[in-house]
Amino acid sequence: MYYFIPAWYGSNRQWHADVTPWYYSSFRFEFDDTFNQIRLFQRQEIASRLLVLSYQPHLRYFLHRHGVLETEVYSIFDDLQDLHDIHTQVLNLRDIEWDSDCQFLYSPFAIVVQKNGKKYAKVEHGVEGFISDIQYFDNNGQISKHYIMDDRGFVSSVIYFDDGQPAYQDYLDPKGIWRFREHLNEGGRVEVNPIFGYRFKQLHYADISQLIAEYFDKYLKRKQEKQDIFIIPSHPHHDQFLFDCLPSDTTKILSLFINRNSQASFKDLAPSFEQADVVLVDREDSLQLLQDLYPELSDKFHHLSPFDTRLRLGRSQTRKESIIYYQLDFSEGIDRQALFQVLSFIAETKNTEVIFGAFSASQEQMEEVESLVNEIIQGQIHTDSLEKGLDYGGAENPLEENQEQELRFQFVNMNDELDLIKTLEFVRLIVDLNKQPHLYTQIAGISAGIPQINLVETVYVEHLKNGYLISDVTEFSKAAHYYTDKLKEWNQALVYSIDKIKEHTGQRFLDKLHHWIEEVTDVKGL
């Protein structure tokens, strides 16, 4: 059995995944090496299981978003709260008890509940539309209780507040009885409900990590077999914790992912590298750096590129138009000259369109780029050269008053990876001319076999293989024509991507992985 112990932790509390409303403006970059590896094992029908250490009341929707809902899961918090064989139900607003004098105010973001003219509660929803949490307020408008809902349709835990500050959190069982209490204002000490003392070794713990360690150890003693292999995505929250908990004779694979483990952090990971048997590295330049930093451990380091198999390969050839996706990055500012080059190419080239894509941009930022694009068109390009054919909006008679003139460019503001996946479905070419190309856009491009044009060399794009590297934005037109004029070059990029994906996601990779593991287990005598 292969066990994956994911590094899905929150930004504020170590053992808690963030519970954030769907409309929060930061781009949710959730994809990581664990999703890539789970899918790899699933496709080859290799027995694997997720061991989730963190508190994740919305775990099922999270796994569903990434296409791994069918994965076998053991959740420590489910065990701690005695949540076994739970019947999933959809929780509606009317399922919750409200006083008869409550008024409900609906907004596009949340439902505010008023009582006697004052805010009494706020009901938040998750990305998928389920009730994710409810905040209750006192007469002074301060938060008094925060109910966190499980995505299976019940209250998972309640945070109680004292003068607007979190005091303690009760973790509930299916009957709504608290099993254990985490004192948030007292260093996180944990108190077990004496009624359930028989399920724990003690009634008081210094912090939640001791409770997790106890149940993790209990699980290993019950389920673990000698030949099991543990895949650990490296994370400062859990590396040492896991190496301390896992028996020394088990095979441990450490996995590095650039969005979680920057190259600057490699020098701090020596203890993890020494205790791991195999280290999987997501980028070739990272592999080289590690071999230079740790020559005595170089045999442990191996390369595995991440791919997101939620994307479908080669869909753009089903469309007459060549759609170009242009990556906006407001943190670097908007390059007017780059916009001009792209718009000029669209204006001069038949059957081409461009999508300007941003991640969780503000309304002001989107208005700014739209205004700049319109300014460039008015001043340097004729609007009529960017017009599509006339659209009569499905009208029976193509009268002049029914006609709508569409333009060959559009703006898309995306909140998460699924939005980008949807946007890229029929895209022929990705253009990212930022100083630091967006990591997930590059991974998505390779995964979908879409060639990319960049100003900066990266490990994900190889010149004339699966992309085009330009030294100046004025070279954009030449690069774009290379991939849009004929299908030959575009097909070559697709074939190159398919070969890369096969190398890192199919039987070819698993044979290599088994070989690396065999080398280790032979040494250990397993």
Q: Where is each model-derived feature located?
A:
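Membrane-proximal helix-turn-helix segments that form the acceptor-binding/catalytic region
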Residues: 217-224, 259-279
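Conserved catalytic-core segment of nucleotide-activated headgroup transferases in glycan assembly
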Residues: 284, 309-394
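A charged, aromatic-enriched C-terminal amphipathic alpha-helix characteristic of glycosyltransferases
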Residues: 487-521
